[in-house]
Amino acid sequence: TTSERGHLLWAAACRRYDLIAEFAEEVLRERFLLMTPALDHSHFDSFLRNKALWHDEVAALKESTVAKLRSNVFRMLIEAGLLSENGNIIPAVLSDRVSEMLSARSPSDIRFFPTARGGR
């Protein structure tokens, strides 16, 4: 289905790019679990500032690169059905077969999604 495809593409992006994976787990999922439904650019910027303290390569990013990265991550979240256009986190309703695929890895790739299902 379209929903499954979006979820799998989001998981693939998280697997490929550590920065996106960490944002998904540390910000998107945590905000969902804390029942704080809004997600906006300031959350991404704060996340990057924190990462820049420990990663020189993040600190060296130009503002134009940060803006493009932010824009792409938010567009991907919207296209995956995990974020509304107005910035509200949409709980991931993972199908059984997608959930099985994501759980096959250790730690589970479910950790990249706004869901109460186990992700560790």
Language-model features: where?
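Hydrophobic, aromatic-lined core segments that form the binding pocket/scaffold
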Residues: 2-7
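Positively charged, polyanion-binding regions of nucleic-acid-associated proteins
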Residues: 9-11, 15-38
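Short, amphipathic alpha-helical segments
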Residues: 14, 18, 38-42, 63-71
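Contiguous, well-ordered alpha-helical segments that form the cores/surfaces of helical PPI scaffolds
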Residues: 22-26, 46, 75
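Amphipathic alpha-helical interaction surfaces
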Residues: 26, 30, 34, 50-54, ...
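Short acidic alpha-helical/loop segments enriched in Asp/Glu that coordinate divalent cations
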Residues: 33-41, 57-61, 88
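DNA-recognition alpha helix
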Residues: 40-56
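Accessory, usually C-terminal, subdomains that scaffold auxiliary metal cofactors
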Residues: 59-120
